[in-house]
Amino acid sequence: MSGFKIRDEMNGVREAPGKTWFWELEAGVIDAGRCIQCGTCVAVCPSDSIAIGADDLPVLAKMCTGCSLCWDFCPRGGLRYEATWTLVDGLENEARAAPWKITGADPGEHNGNGTRPVRAVDTVRERYSARSRQPVAGGQDGGLVSALLIALLDAGEIDGALLARQSETERWKAEPYLATTPEEVRAAAGTIYNQTMGLGYLDRKLLSRRGLPPDARLAAVGTPCEVQGIKAMHARPWHRGSSKVDNVVLTIALLCTKSFNYEKLMVELVAAQRGIPLEAIGRVDVIRGQLVVQDHERTTIIEEPIKNFHGAALKGCDECADFLGNAADLSVGSVGSADGRSTLLVRSEAGSRALEIARDCLELRDLERPEALDKLDRLDKRTAFKTLKRPFDPEAPMFIDYLEHLERYAGSDRAPVVADR
């Protein structure tokens, strides 16, 4: 029996107006195959009714109260994610979100409204190619993120960092982790290419388990969609208590065009189809459009175009035009910098402060290839604009009603699916 039918048969009680239930999120996002596993719905639920299922997707763990928040804050549901781009402080704020700058048109081309697009990478406060001065074992592209977090921990600027580390039980599967020491940050260094439902992991009980006070200051490292959820929750007035992400004082987005399903990518495509035991893998990277897998001796055992693995990508990622992580205080990734370095984009006062604290630990030089960032940013936007079934507008209201979503997506390959339970 479907969740909708159960609800409709509940003692004939008329539904209060304006409610959106978990079942709508389930139909419009999860069962429609559009969930991007950011964990925002788990984090935002005030009654802790949503949990993380065995398949790493949101599930209803107890009665839904119909508060609508899981729908409202989902980047594939009711959250107009591009509206979070305007929530970053700084003079470039308005310019970065202006619609005529995000159409995906080539620089120099008119957009049909009398204006010319400006590269999004040109709207940040600062931009560098950077790496850690000290080697970080296993660190990605110069260990920049690890060095930043360690410097902030050492300075007492943050008490912990929400990040991803490799699972202790499933090889090459990422899991969320709250690191509270430089040693824990170093142990989690490197990139793994599946989502972790990370925001669903963060709550006050976690702080207590990790020996942190209720007012602990945290950095969050994640994909742009995770940052979108954090910034949206920060912007909402919480009349009862606070949100579970109030402790996050710094967001670091990892440049991202898509994330992958662990089972499909590592278990099926890598281990089963290509005959590579997961325990034999020492490193996985995406370098210049190639998926590169190496063994523990750094011998390359797979080097193929990443497009060969797109069947394992999360379907909902195609709707995201936020490769650069435009809502984040800092964005970091390999595109635009030479091997062994990371691109660092600074957008906010919090980002500038973090960089200043960590500056002595980093080697900074001018961003080497901003045009590479711009090219991939425009390609990412074009893909999203073709895939989205709704208008893309950072200046529109932040939240999208479920009925509006239903109207936009009905009849498409991303239409809501009501599954029997």
Q: At which residue positions do the language-model features occur?
A:
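Iron-sulfur cluster-binding cysteine motifs and their immediate structural context
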Residues: 18, 27-36, 40-59, 69-90, ...
